């Protein structure tokens, strides 16, 4: 199987070429154009920007650890806040661990929601869009609640 070549005898294509609309009509092959020329330039540019920023503006690693001064509450990184909140608020620890494990299991089921639907527009896929919206709101709610004291963490201190 080779590169699809245009039929230059096609009158529609000849009309487009005459108007200057035929460039890239059939696309360019990824080999060798993209893989040998464009990708390395982008990768080297990204590495150069990262190294340049690291040299020009080095960030501090943080305060040195003090084993004799422990913070009152140890919080995980920000992206673990929702599952930390689940583990913190569920009284049964086994149930909390099972609920934490249900997060990736639920994420694995998302592609199979309405997978027979041929539409890519999210407004024409109501079930998947609703699941995404509810999951996003729940993750933000739990993430904000994880930063608050345990007493007002589920209500975010509003009630």
Curated annotation (Swiss-Prot):
Q: Name one Pfam family in it.
A: Cytochrom_B_C
Protein's UniProt keywords contain Cytoplasm: no
Q: What does this protein do?
A: Component of the cytochrome b6-f complex, which mediates electron transfer between photosystem II (PSII) and photosystem I (PSI), cyclic electron flow around PSI, and state transitions.
Membrane-topology annotation of the record: Multi-pass membrane protein
Give the family this protein belongs to, as stated in its UniProt record. Belongs to the cytochrome b family. PetD subfamily.
InterPro entries, sorted: Cyt_b/b6_C (IPR005798), Cyt_b/b6_C_sf (IPR036150), Cyt_b6/f_cplx_suIV (IPR005870), Cytochrome_b_C_euk/bac (IPR048260)
Arranged from A to Z, the UniProt key words for this protein are: Chloroplast, Electron transport, Membrane, Photosynthesis, Plastid, Thylakoid, Transmembrane, Transmembrane helix, Transport
Could you read off the lineage of the organism from its UniProt record?
Eukaryota, Viridiplantae, Streptophyta, Embryophyta, Tracheophyta
Q: Which GO terms describe its biological process?
A: mitochondrial electron transport, ubiquinol to cytochrome c; photosynthetic electron transport chain
Q: Which residue spans traverse the membrane?
A: 35-55, 94-114, 130-150
GO MF entry, a single one? electron transporter, transferring electrons within the cyclic electron transport pathway of photosynthesis activity
What is the name of the protein in this document? Answer: Cytochrome b6-f complex subunit 4
Organism, as annotated: Adiantum capillus-veneris
How is the subunit organization of this protein annotated in UniProt? The 4 large subunits of the cytochrome b6-f complex are cytochrome b6, subunit IV (17 kDa polypeptide, petD), cytochrome f and the Rieske protein, while the 4 small subunits are petG, petL, petM and petN. The complex functions as a dimer.
């Amino acid at each position: 199987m080779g590169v699809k070549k245009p039929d230059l005898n096609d009158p529609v294509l000849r009309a487009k070429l005459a108007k200057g609309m035929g460039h890239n009509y059939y696309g360019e092959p990824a080999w060798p154009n993209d893989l040998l020329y464009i990708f390395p330039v982008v990768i080297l540019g990204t590495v150069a920007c990262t190294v340049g920023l690291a040299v020009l503006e080095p960030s501090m690693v943080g305060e040195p650890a003090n084993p004799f001064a422990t913070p009152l509450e140890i919080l995980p990184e920000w992206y673990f806040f929702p599952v930390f909140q689940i583990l913190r608020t569920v009284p049964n620890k086994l149930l909390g661990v099972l609920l934490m494990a249900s997060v990736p299991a639920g994420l694995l089921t998302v592609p199979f929601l309405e997978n027979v639907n041929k539409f890519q527009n999210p407004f024409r896929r109501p079930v998947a869009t609703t699941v995404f919206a509810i999951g996003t709101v729940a993750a933000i709610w739990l993430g904000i609640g994880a930063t608050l004291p345990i007493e007002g963490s589920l209500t975010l201190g509003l009630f």
